[in-house]
């Protein structure tokens, strides 16, 4: 199982430089070929950044229909634990929360373009490594 960071979705949805690679990677998750998890925090972050009802609905439908993707709903206690990790692992809150979830699910890697994850004990991978 992999944890997919918010920036992978945004790269595609905002039509950024690596959009095509992210699309192919996310298609493998959608088909169930790759198993992955995201947090409800990721869902809300994408919604807030898109700020367009049509794009948000399309994103949510894709998440809902993705065979290989689970959305993990964090509990308040877990968010508190992630906030206490921030200083120790030198990550901001959203990255610390993703790290916390990655540890909880014992993921193989965090798929992200965020190099801050290179400092933790879980491997960071990029989408092209799964194509």
Label every PLM stretch briefly.
Residues 1, 100, 104-131:
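Acidic, PIN/NYN-like endoribonuclease modules and their adjacent C-terminal/linker elements
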Residues 70-113:
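Active-site neighborhoods of divalent-metal-dependent phosphate/nucleic-acid chemistry enzymes
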């Amino acid at each position: 199982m992999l944890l997919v960071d918010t920036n992978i979705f945004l790269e595609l949805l905002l039509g950024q430089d690596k959009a095509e690679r992210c699309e192919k990677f996310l298609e493998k998750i959608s088909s169930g070929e790759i198993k992955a998890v995201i947090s409800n925090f990721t869902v809300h972050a994408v919604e807030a950044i898109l700020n367009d009802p049509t794009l948000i609905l399309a994103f949510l439908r894709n998440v809902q229909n993705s065979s290989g993707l689970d959305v993990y709903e964090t509990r308040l206690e877990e968010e508190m634990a992630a906030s206490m990790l921030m200083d120790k692992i030198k990550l901001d809150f959203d990255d610390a929360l993703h790290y916390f979830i990655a540890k909880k699910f014992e993921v193989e890697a965090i798929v992200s373009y965020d190099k801050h994850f290179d400092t933790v004990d879980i491997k960071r991978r990029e989408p092209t490594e799964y194509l």
